[in-house]
Design a protein with these regions (language model features):
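Short, charged, intrinsically disordered terminal tails
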Residues: 1-4
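Compact, glycine-rich, soluble single-domain proteins
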Residues: 6-80
């Protein structure tokens, strides 16, 4: 799909979300992160707070992270 990137949110117990998204917004240790398709590779800690997934149709899903890490690759985003 053009304009999307695969995103996985994984907790210690299970995979919470897996699918294509238009963007991801989360709070990194140094501030707000906005990730879109084609973003440069990144590994960052994330602070406790909402993780907002924007779908291709503009709808949003919001998850709560109690902290963790975000890994961004050209074709995938993983939040642990």
């Amino acid at each position: 799909m053009a304009g999307t990137v695969h995103c996985s949110i994984v907790s210690a117990e299970q995979e919470v979300f897996s699918g294509d998204v238009a963007s991801v917004v989360a709070t990194g240790t140094l501030g707000e992160l906005g990730i879109h398709p084609g973003h440069t590779a990144l590994l960052s800690g994330i602070k406790a707070g909402p993780v907002r997934l924007v779908m291709e149709d503009g709808s949003e899903e919001i998850f709560f992270a109690s902290g963790g890490f975000i890994e961004v690759q050209p074709t995938a985003i993983t939040i642990l």
